[in-house]
C-alpha cells in the first residue's frame, strides 16, 4: 500500500477573498453579522407556483437580490441565471481580494453546481411546444450547460490553468474548493477562483424532494423554526438560495502581492459511501474517513480540531450519520459544532462554498454563531453543538463538512492565520 501523504509535503495555501449572497444578505460580512445575531433567512414562499401546484412545502429562503441590473444588455442576452450569478459574484470577489494582478496562465476556476440550470430546459420545452423551433435561441446551449457558470468566470478573468465544474449534488461547492486546493498544491496553479452557485427555488425540485417524504420539512407555520439540525424532533431540510466564491492562492503568491489573508486552507479530502443513491451510510464510515484524510493532509492530529462546520441538513438519517462520522474521525475530541442550515437553508450545489466562508470567518473572528432551533439534542448524537448564544473561543483549526446524494463526501481543513 502506498504511504499516506501528509501536509508537510505541500505549499501553504491561503484564502484571500470572499464573496457570497444568501437568504439573509447580499454579502458575506452582513450574512455573518446576522448569523451571530441569531437571524433566519427562511420565510413563507410567495411564488405563484406554490398555490398553482398546491405544494406541501411553502417555506424557503430566496435571495434578497436579482443580478440583472448589475449586467449589460449583451451579458443578459448571453447568460443564463447561474452565469449571471457567478459573474456578479466573481466581480465582487475580485474587488474583495484587492483586484490583484495575476499571471492568467497560473489562474484557474473551479465552480460547482448541483441542480444547475435543469429547470431552464423545462421552460424552453414549454416555449418550443407553443411556438416551435424558432422559440429556441442559438444561445440556449451556452446559457444552460452545467459548466457555464465556471466558464463565464474563466473567460472574464482569462484563466488558463483550468476551468472545472464539479457536479456532486450537495457537495459540489465544497468539492470545487477541494479540487482547486489540489491543483494548487500539485503546482498546476498559483491561484484559484472557487466555490459554488445554485439556481432559484422552483416547483419541480420542491415537488421531487417532497415526494421522498423524509427529507424536507413541512413546518409551514413556523418558517424560521422549521429546520432543526441535530434536534430530536427534526423533520427535514428547507431550501435556501445562495452562491459563494473564494479566492485561494499560495501563501507565497499572496504575500508577494500584499494580499489581506483571511485564513489558511490546509487540506481537503473527497470520498464516497458506495452505499445508496440518496441515503448516507448510517455508520458514517467514509464520511469520517474524509475528515480523517483532510486532517492528515493538513499535517494535523484529530485533537487539533477546535471547530466543525457541519453539513447537518436537519434530516433524521443524515444528521445521525454525520454525528457518527465526526466521532469516528475525532475520537474523544469534542470540537464546537455549528449547523448554519438552521438559519440559511440548503442551497444544494452552493452550500459547501457558503459554509466554507462561514468557517473562514469563524476562524478570523474567533467566534461561532449559534445553531438555531436546537431545543432537545438527539440523545443518539454525541456532539458539542453551539446553540443559544454565539460562542467565543480559541479556534485554531476547523473542518467544513459537505455531503451529497450519490454518496459524495467532502471535508476541508481550514486554519487560523
Swiss-Prot record:
Originating species: Mycobacterium tuberculosis (strain ATCC 25618 / H37Rv)
GO MF terms, alphabetically ordered: 3-oxoacyl-[acyl-carrier-protein] synthase activity
Keywords linked to the UniProt accession: Acyltransferase, Cytoplasm, Fatty acid biosynthesis, Fatty acid metabolism, Lipid biosynthesis, Lipid metabolism, Phosphoprotein, Transferase
Subcellular location: Cytoplasm
CDD domains in the cross-refs: KAS_I_II (cd00834)
Domain of life of the native organism: Bacteria
Record's subunit section: Homodimer.
Domain Ketosynthase family 3 (KS3) positions: 10-416
Main location: cytoplasm
Name by which UniProt lists this protein: 3-oxoacyl-[acyl-carrier-protein] synthase 2
